[in-house]
Amino acid sequence: MDNVAEMPEEKYVEVDDFLRLAVKFYNTLGIDPYETGRKRTIWFQIYFALNMFNMVFSFYAEVATLVDRLRDNENFLESCILLSYVSFVVMGLSKIGAVMKKKPKMTALVRQLETCFPSPSAKVQEEYAVKSWLKRCHIYTKGFGGLFMIMYFAHALIPLFIYFIQRVLLHYPDAKQIMPFYQLEPWEFRDSWLFYPSYFHQSSAGYTATCGSIAGDLMIFAVVLQVIMHYERLAKVLREFKIQAHNAPNGAKEDIRKLQSLVANHIDILRLTDLMNEVFGIPLLLNFIASALLVCLVGVQLTIALSPEYFCKQMLFLISVLLEVYLLCSFSQRLIDASENVGHAAYDMDWLGSDKRFKKILIFISMRSQKPVCLKATVVLDLSMPTMSIFLGMSYKFFCAVRTMYQ
């Protein structure tokens, strides 16, 4: 008999495909952001505990160094650099703490995403354009994550690289051993083998803070893109809705049945949005406060004479923070536009020949769409592109105040 080659089964997109990169960053810290049914070993929990201990220890050492430098009025620049690092660590710690505290809510959010996600069918997933949305998700998440990792490695490796060149290649007798983030430790590390373990512990703490910040943002991007996907599909179906009231005996009832299923879908998306804001609200608020302070402090540093390596590191820092805030505002604006588009689609559809009950349901859809949804930093702030202008204005005011103090 001839051997018949089996056709490989087509792999359909799942919710995990959107969340995979964010989950990987969390896993490198020893964190499962939501319940997966996979039982972790005790070593995974020990790894998380060691990461947190190292990060908290570094945070207190960094604060102690900052206090010591603030006592010396001549070290204003170093104080600004240290304060920017402290702000970044606080942002990373707050995001890690938020995801640990909100883990049950995060699990509920992922389960809701899985419930609403298109079924594993080529026709259904094509209707939602799932592959196209996944491609966009990968572009944003990989690009953003890559930029932050470049920023981290620039801060973590440049001091060691400079020391290696001066000591090994140029044979400078007075080559200084400089730590990546702060220069005060409870032990003496200079001209000692303790320099390398100390350097590793600071670099590891920086990685934890960076990954904590990255993972939270990537999770937000992945969830928001899926919600926008659902809104876009709903608007498309409404626009292409074919009224059957005058074309079939039970056409009016069939029209109402189909529209009711779309209304139920709309309600599910709205619930998904509410749950998303409940999970990410506090991290978004803390993110904006810390980012405004970071932009201010790094901006001040760039206006002062800096060495080339410091300038490059801080420029990467500034670009990363500004891009983070811009993307959050941009995604929220797209969410606003997509939710409003549902109301426009309800008006644009061919509803003139429909039943009266059908028209009443359409009115409710349009009325609900007049209140667009967006990312909410708790009740304090609704994110949108105008929020970016507010953020830049607030950062500039901080910048002017700090610059005046320096002068």
UniProtKB/Swiss-Prot annotation:
Alphabetized, the UniProt keywords read: Cell membrane, Membrane, Olfaction, Receptor, Sensory transduction, Transducer, Transmembrane, Transmembrane helix
Membrane-spanning residues: 41-61, 80-100, 145-165, 209-229, 279-300, 315-331, 379-401
Q: How does it sit in the membrane?
A: Multi-pass membrane protein
Which parts of the chain does the record assign to the membrane side Extracellular? 62-79, 166-208, 301-314, 402-407
Q: Does the keyword Transmembrane apply?
A: yes
- Recall the GO molecular function terms of this protein's record: ionotropic olfactory receptor activity; odorant binding; olfactory receptor activity
Cytoplasmic compartment ranges equal 1-40, 101-144, 230-278, 332-378
- Cellular component terms, GO, for this chain's entry? dendrite membrane; plasma membrane
Q: Does the keyword Transmembrane apply?
A: yes
* Localization, UniProt: Cell membrane
Among InterPro entries, the record links this protein to: 7tm6_olfct_rcpt (IPR004117)
Annotated GO biological processes are:
detection of chemical stimulus involved in sensory perception of smell; signal transduction
Q: In which tissues is it expressed?
A: Expressed in olfactory sensory neurons in the antenna.
Q: Which residues form the signal peptide?
A: none
Additional comments on file?
The atypical heteromeric and topological design of the odorant receptors appears to be an insect-specific solution for odor recognition, making the OR/Orco complex an attractive target for the development of highly selective insect repellents to disrupt olfactory-mediated host-seeking behaviors of insect disease vectors. Odor-evoked OR currents are independent of known G-protein-coupled second messenger pathways.
Q: State the family it belongs to.
A: Belongs to the insect chemoreceptor superfamily. Heteromeric odorant receptor channel (TC 1.A.69) family. Or49a subfamily.
Instruction: Read off the PANTHER family from this record.
Output: ODORANT RECEPTOR (PTHR21137), ODORANT RECEPTOR 13A-RELATED (PTHR21137:SF44)
- What does the record note on quaternary structure? Interacts with Orco. Complexes exist early in the endomembrane system in olfactory sensory neurons (OSNs), coupling these complexes to the conserved ciliary trafficking pathway.
Q: What does this protein do?
A: Odorant receptor which mediates acceptance or avoidance behavior, depending on its substrates. The odorant receptor repertoire encodes a large collection of odor stimuli that vary widely in identity, intensity, and duration. Forms a complex with Orco to form odorant-sensing units, providing sensitive and prolonged odorant signaling and calcium permeability. Involved in the behavioral responses to benzaldehyde and acetophenone.
Can you say what this protein is called?
A: Odorant receptor 67a
